């Protein structure tokens, strides 16, 4: 009985352990579309983009509230532990002196008044405490923005801002579909690679074991065994690399989907290359791209900004009113019948109009107009860039399709060469070295083929994204 090599046993043991853990862990099945739908609900970046739309809508409602009556109430209570002191001119002493002189004169007595004593400035000021220990006031006020050009323009800007955030959601959706699709294809391609590698390992291992048996019987040299063992070890190393690559690509897919669970992912779509016809290079419609749409909205906002500055010359009118009750006491008996509350009411309005600002607003308008012109140039440049990107994406895809066709043909030829060389060797009419060379060529053809498959799939996603057709 032919013994398996130690590293073969190690790989087999690792595979069994992996399968055991996989059976213990839960699995979730996803097609490509299901992966995308899952990402819509769980990708943090996409969810933030949707939240930005809600925030923009709430911001518009906030601005709408500025035109509604602003009503407020307040209650104020003060306890003056030291009643405020006021300093007054001494009008009491001159008045008292004048009264005394007048009384003496009325009595018929000869009295001559002193003018200095009639001047209150010749007496020291009087310090007096005015008020009560406790003062309370309850008031209600209301104001209404009757007219403001800034408000009207700002309200229009909030509507455009909502459009901006909606387009940003579309852009995030396109990016998400692109990222999830590429990650999904990466997993599929690597799993196809591992299947072919496993098949090649099985074939080469059988050939190696047979060659060892022939060597023991003296039919082949040890160098023939060594050559096959080197080739076998290289395949095992390649297998381990692809296994790790599958794990990495699955983690990338989970990340793009926003998948936080530890469960295994089972991809239900197969790697079928059916639609691989070349694309006719045509002019890309830039208006279908979210980036172009975002700049269009930005241009509308630039126009609104110019209007806002121009309308800033118009006045702003605000109406307001207030009503209050106040009570002043030396104790806290505020709600007895003998104590009175004193009402105050007012109604007013404020009209604000800028007369001259040193031409500041004029130059702000000129800057805003230049921003609009810069936006036009940026929009035109983006249109040219999108057209170039679409043409480049079509060329890249067509090149990938052509490369895939060549690599598929090379793979078929390599398989045939390997099969023929193996049969010739088993029949004793071929050399061991011929088998090794055929196997090496087959491995390279498989790598090139799967790279071409992945490139074709990725370039197709890039083409659909560049032409604005990735998300319908």
Regions found by a protein language model. Name each.
Residues 36-40, 92-123, 259-322:
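Amphipathic alpha-helical coiled-coil scaffold segments and their short linker/junction regions
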Residues 47-51, 64-65, 146-173, 223, ...:
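Sec/SRP-type N-terminal targeting helices
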